Amino acid sequence: VLVRMNMDGTGHTEIARLPEQNALDGRKQLGGSYFFDNGYLIFLAFPCTSNPDYALPVYKIQLEPGETTQLFQEDIPLLTDWPADGVSISNGYIYFPMPQAKASEYAFAEGNLETGRIELVFEDWNKMNSAVVNFDNVLYYHRAGIGLCEYDKATGTETVKLPMDVYYANVSYTKDYIFLRTLDSADFNQCVLLAYDRDYNLLGKLELEKI
């Protein structure tokens, strides 16, 4: 149940009941990921993987008055699992992996939250890539083992702006800065904190050893 309350904990009001996923044997599947954005709750639900034709359900729930709409039904392939991480919302779009089974690479989608349709799909997305940020229809992200990248939606061109051969990078973009926390391997032996300006000039670096 989606509930609204005052900041002091009073005034609980039920807005909507979250959609349930029903298995063929009658069992109900609950839970998923929740993202609040611009007056909506975006809900990526756990699919009922026991059903032979399951796919990831994505819902948009209006906080006023609680109307629920399922998104991307025509675009998400069958047997698409729930993405455990890598989901982000930016500039009216949701970016999310579409994992199939246990593949190391999978499709990664850009979905328009207004139209409810997927507009862009990267077919070779590595699960260690970072989340995506959209500024003025240019996508910013880190590709594992490649570096910091920009994808211009107008031209369909990806550019590696800062080559960086690291196993993983958690990236945060602001208006003026880029902050990274990189890891050297799956064992996480060394963590490096980095700060750049938006022209990719290094401003600071701190190396942390695993304790």
Q: Model segments located where?
A:
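N-terminal "mature head" segments of proteins
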Residues: 1-27, 31-34, 204, 209
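Structural motif
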Residues: 2-3, 49-60, 102-110, 145-150, ...
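Short loop/turn segments that connect beta-strands within beta-propeller blades
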Residues: 6-10, 62-66, 112-116, 152-156, ...
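Beta-propeller fold detector
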Residues: 13-19, 69-75, 119-124, 159-164, ...
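Hydrophilic extracytoplasmic domains
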Residues: 143, 149-211
